[in-house]
């Protein structure tokens, strides 16, 4: 029989119960027993939603209090030694690995965090050593599976496969071949399968998303040997791939001794024919035909026709599913009561997406007439979207068509610009700055909420925001920072804020998705041509600059990041949408410069995460991404200093594209990787200024002055002294004021020590063996 199933459901809860509960636990306001009870309630709710929608096989084990990769590391005992001695409680150990701090107050450096493939979700990077051992450590998966079965759900446990787990991890200390760990790791996976089998489970979903990447031959071979060795203890295994095409890994994937294969049709429709021709006759094919990464409703008529053709070849060996876990979309469109009615009809969130999968499955089982009403209603929606006049703006399209190469070049090269900027800004050696946002207190969040709900008027809102900006400027001046920011109190999110002010973009009320841990974001929905009617940031920056003689940065989010962190229209190339955003930002940049702003930051933290997963497609992306940044940033004079910021980036393979952005200063997130990212600059002479993040803002832990100095001096191995900036590694929005002021005070102290050590002597007086790079 054709089944409807799902790869994973959002964890956060319809009202973000997960966030509220886990943060209460971190604050010591609830017990661990209360924490676990909330986990049970959230999972039961998720399973009920899916079952009532008509999903046959319910994913179990997709819930996590922080991150599923972290859960897998803890489950198999891959707990770094620095955490083992700190916490006997496995839950607190997990939180300490993620945050550097457990609820019991014990601190150490957190594990590294990076992006999950090309999504905006972050995972905690497993750490492996040459003497790594593994053992079954955590029973959360088994408890959840038992709970689902006891509640009469047909449970399909979901785990990250052994090869993807190793690939996504990192060698700590001495480098070695991670594949050597398989011998110790596979017996633990076998234990997991044995316990699941003993519970009466029929199917297990093993996620191996790295099969859509360019894999070295030894990793391809490892798939064959690994899955031949794995003992599933009579469980049926659905091997799940997503985010791209199997491509050159298709043949080996079809050889693996598993019972079913899931493919992502939405991201890689061209692979379908090859998969059908190579799939062994006994295996299930799960077709991910519902887009798990975007919010547009499915064209059910078109999808059903495609699935009917597949069914004619496979019969009951066909399953229907979303393309990937629904972790990446909001939970329930029914919670949106402020969206424009026509726009809302075009959307589908997680609850609606599992219903779409169930509708299609019923159509395959019982014939089209069984879902005739749904098909008719859906067809009306699809036609409405295609013919709506609100999508296209002739003025925007004309402006985009008139863009020339000249608009994407600064007046002179960076060396000339730097001399002019140095004369104008009068900055010291090792200039200090922050990335943009400052702590957002509950009072600020309540202020914005009350303003949006009409509880306070424009005048009171303006007064309160100005008070906050004045306080932030005053704190920075007192701390001794060199280039200031206004703190962004008016912004709820660095992308959503601009989405609210740009035409062609819709904002939801409850469209939350998980970014990392308890942090949730509400991605804007780009439904049509994008344009700017009026300045978006000018009044706040002008006010902030009026309070100080020091430079205050204009703060913008770049075109690629707005694109990456939004749900994007799928009726034109993403590059065209990015160009429209860039043109809107260019107007804002020029308005800021005309008002006297001397430093403008255009954040592109998503620049690398948007890289296609296959290298063959990189060049095309990098070309249009660089052009869009330059289109946004190059309309200013030489004297205006352009900054950009990037997160979680490995620069080695795209360093030339980073340089091609031609930002005067780039700040990068590097503290958790212990400045390993800076090795990118070892062989490539990056010509512009760099500010490597020298303390981790994602952890509540406050670094010592000596730690900051050490990281800065390490950076000098790769960056000439006159080009090195001192800054945190990301915005400070999620930290509290006490942490922020103390950490920044230590950062400024470290910069002062560095100036003293390097300004008057050829060799630093700081007691470190590292020597600075030459110019």
UniProtKB/Swiss-Prot annotation:
Key words, A-Z: Amino-acid biosynthesis, Metal-binding, Methionine biosynthesis, Methyltransferase, Repeat, Transferase, Zinc
Catalytic activity: 5-methyltetrahydropteroyltri-L-glutamate + L-homocysteine = tetrahydropteroyltri-L-glutamate + L-methionine
GO biological process: methionine biosynthetic process; methylation
Chain sites annotated for binding Zn(2+): 645, 647, 669, 730
SUPFAM superfamilies, per the entry: UROD/MetE-like
Pathway field: Amino-acid biosynthesis; L-methionine biosynthesis via de novo pathway; L-methionine from L-homocysteine (MetE route): step 1/1
Cofactor note: Binds 1 zinc ion per subunit.
Binding site for 5-methyltetrahydropteroyltri-L-glutamate: 16-19, 115, 519-520, 565, 609
Gene Ontology MF terms in the entry: 5-methyltetrahydropteroyltriglutamate-homocysteine S-methyltransferase activity; zinc ion binding
Cofactor: Zn(2+)
Cited NCBIfam families: met_syn_B12ind, PRK05222.1
Identification of the protein by name: 5-methyltetrahydropteroyltriglutamate--homocysteine methyltransferase
């Amino acid at each position: 029989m054709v089944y409807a199933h799902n790869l994973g459901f959002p964890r956060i809860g319809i009202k973000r119960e997960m966030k509220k509960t886990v943060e209460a636990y971190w604050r010591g306001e609830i017990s661990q027993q209360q924490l676990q009870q909330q986990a049970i309630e959230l999972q039961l709710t998720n399973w009920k939603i899916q079952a009532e929608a008509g999903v046959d096989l319910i994913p179990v084990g997709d819930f996590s209090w922080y991150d599923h990769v972290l859960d897998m590391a803890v489950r198999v005992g891959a707990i770094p030694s620095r955490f083992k001695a700190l916490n006997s409680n496995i839950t607190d150990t997990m939180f300490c690995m993620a945050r550097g701090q457990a609820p019991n107050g014990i601190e150490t450096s957190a594990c590294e965090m990076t992006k999950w493939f090309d999504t905006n979700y972050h995972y905690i990077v497993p750490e492996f050593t040459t003497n790594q051992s593994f053992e079954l450590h955590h029973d959360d998966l088994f408890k959840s599976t038992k709970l689902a079965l006891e509640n009469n759900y047909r449970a399909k446990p979901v785990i990250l496969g052994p090869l993807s787990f190793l690939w996504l991890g990192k060698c700590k200390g001495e480098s070695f071949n991670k594949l050597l760990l398989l011998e110790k790791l596979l017996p633990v996976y076998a234990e997991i399968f044995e316990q699941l089998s003993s519970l009466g489970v029929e199917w297990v979903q093993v996620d191996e998303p790295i099969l859509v990447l360019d894999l070295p031959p030894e990793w391809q071979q490892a798939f064959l040997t690994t899955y031949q060795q794995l003992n599933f203890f009579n469980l049926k295994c659905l091997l799940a791939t997503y985010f791209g095409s199997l491509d050159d890994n298709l043949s080996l994937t079809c050889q693996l001794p598993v019972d079913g294969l899931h493919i992502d049709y939405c991201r890689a429709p061209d692979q379908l024919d090859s998969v059908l021709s190579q799939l062994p006759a006994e295996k299930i094919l799960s077709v991910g035909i519902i887009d798990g990464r975007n919010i547009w409703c499915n064209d059910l008529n078109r999808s059903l026709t495609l699935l009917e053709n597949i069914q004619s070849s496979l019969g009951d060996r066909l399953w229907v599913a979303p393309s990937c876990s629904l972790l990446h979309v909001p939970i329930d469109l029914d919670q949106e009561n402020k969206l424009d009615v026509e726009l809302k009809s075009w959307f589908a969130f997680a609850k609606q997406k599992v219903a779409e999968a169930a509708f299609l499955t019923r159509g395959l089982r019982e014939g089209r007439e069984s879902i005739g009403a749904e098909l008719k209603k859906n067809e009306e929606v699809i036609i409405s979207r295609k013919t709506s006049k609100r999508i296209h703006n002739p003025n925007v399209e004309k402006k985009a068509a008139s863009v020339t190469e000249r608009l994407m070049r600064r007046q002179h090269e960076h060396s000339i610009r730097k001399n002019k900027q140095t004369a104008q800004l009068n900055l010291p050696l090792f200039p200090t700055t922050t990335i943009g946002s400052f702590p957002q207190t509950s009072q600020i969040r309540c202020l914005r909420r009350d303003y949006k709900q009409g509880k306070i008027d424009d005048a009171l809102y303006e007064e309160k925001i100005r008070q906050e900006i004045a306080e932030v400027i005053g704190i920075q001046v007192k701390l001794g920072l060199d280039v200031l920011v206004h703190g962004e109190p008016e912004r709820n999110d660095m992308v959503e804020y601009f989405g609210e002010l740009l035409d062609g973009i819709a904002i939801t009320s409850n469209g939350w998705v998980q970014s990392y841990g308890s942090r949730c974001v509400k991605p804007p929905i780009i439904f049509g041509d994008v344009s700017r009617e009026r300045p978006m940031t000018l009044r706040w920056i002008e006010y902030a600059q009026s309070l100080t003689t020091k430079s205050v940065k204009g703060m913008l989010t770049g075109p690629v990041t707005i694109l990456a962190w939004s749900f994007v229209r799928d009726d034109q190339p993403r590059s065209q949408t990015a160009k429209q955003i860039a043109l809107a930002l260019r107007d804002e940049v020029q308005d800021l410069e005309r008002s006297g702003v001397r430093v403008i930051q255009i954040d592109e933290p998503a620049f690398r995460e948007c890289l296609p997963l296959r290298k063959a497609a990189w060049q095309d992306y990098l070309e249009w991404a660089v052009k869009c940044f330059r289109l946004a940033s190059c309309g200013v004079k030489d004297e205006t200093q352009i900054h950009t910021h990037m997160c979680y980036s490995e620069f080695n393979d795209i360093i030339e594209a980073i340089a091609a952005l031609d930002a005067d200063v780039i700040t990068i997130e590097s503290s958790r990787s212990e400045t390993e990212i800076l090795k990118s600059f070892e062989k490539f002479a990056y010509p512009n200024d760099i500010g490597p993040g020298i303390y981790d803002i994602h952890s509540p832990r406050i670094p010592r002055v000596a730690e900051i100095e050490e990281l800065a001096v390490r950076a000098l191995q790769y960056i000439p002294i006159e080009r090195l900036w001192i800054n945190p590694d990301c915005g400070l929005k999620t930290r509290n004021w006490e942490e922020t002021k103390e950490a920044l005070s230590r950062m400024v102290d470290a910069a002062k020590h560095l100036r003293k050590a390097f300004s008057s002597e050829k060799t630093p007086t700081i007691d470190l063996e590292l020597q600075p790079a030459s110019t």
